[in-house]
Regions:
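Intrinsically disordered, low-complexity linker/terminal regions across diverse proteins
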Residues: 1-100, 105-268
């Protein structure tokens, strides 16, 4: 058993408690290396007094979808600036940040992995053969697009390893675009106001993905990260949006032009 290492720490010293518990776990594994043991120490507060690293801790800045439960987890830490701001930021800002995050996670329920589970979280092939064929063709098209866009930057990558995240980005963005369109329509916005709203949304969407990255890190990311590089997380979904291409006058043959296929809607 692991002794109660936080017994002498103040109750409000959350960092001290976490650090002590982390050290205890590390030392426990070292002591038991090569041995068979059933008690696995863990690192997170729970109602049972134990600790476990499960990604749902409120201090985790993340959100994720669980296909076996068909739900999304949104830890409290992401519900603050810069991910959401109800006081000083615009509707378009919040939609492009936390709204896009929600849309992305919702969309994982019907990506290339999530689609294999039914609404109860059971692995079950509930698809009709024809629907499955069409879906798989869309998966192949996403892989083709991301690999092509990367090749223009001299990057060779296997986009099939990250296609689930790519599909969630594409579908999540389309959910936001559809919602923004309905929102502005319900406000009675004229076309010029609508266009400005979309321009603002697209600008914030690109802004939140800004990144400076070393070439060595690029090579590491494309081999280990299930997410595409952020440049392609931005450009590839946008290149599929008819509204984006119309607003910015993007034509066939431009590098930011792909077919108007956002997985679950096809405007062509």
């Amino acid at each position: 058993m692991i002794e109660d290492l936080d017994a002498d720490l103040p109750e409000d010293d959350a960092y001290g408690i976490m650090f002590a518990q982390s050290q205890a776990v590390r030392e426990y594994y070292i002591r038991n290396e090569g041995k068979h043991f059933a008690e696995l120490p863990s690192i997170d507060f729970s109602v049972n007094g134990g600790l476990s690293l499960n990604g749902t801790q409120p201090y985790i800045v993340n959100a994720f979808y669980n296909p076996t439960k068909n739900n999304i987890y949104v830890p409290a830490a992401i519900l603050q600036d810069p991910f959401v701001s109800l006081d000083s930021k615009s509707f378009e800002y919040n939609l492009s940040h936390i709204g896009y995050t929600f849309g992305h996670e919702f969309s994982h329920s019907l990506d290339n992995t999530g689609r294999l589970y039914d609404h109860r979280g059971n692995m079950n092939n509930w698809w009709k053969k024809e629907d499955e064929r069409i879906f798989n063709s869309k998966v192949s098209d996403v892989i083709k697009q991301y690999e092509l866009f990367a090749s223009w930057d001299g990057i060779k990558m296997d986009a099939s390893t990250m296609v689930g995240e790519s599909m969630a980005d594409i579908s999540g963005m389309e959910l936001c675009i559809g919602y923004l369109n309905r929102y502005l329509t319900n406000l009675g916005a004229i076309d010029k106001i609508k266009e400005q709203g979309f321009r603002t949304f697209f600008a914030y969407l690109a802004y939140q993905w800004r990144e400076a990255i070393y070439k060595q890190a690029i090579r590491f990311n494309i081999k280990t990260n299930p997410h595409p590089l952020v440049k392609y997380r931005t450009n590839c979904p946008l290149a599929r949006s008819m509204i984006f291409k119309n607003i910015f006058n993007i034509k066939k043959g431009d590098h930011m032009c792909w077919k108007n296929d956002t997985i679950w809607s096809n405007d062509e």
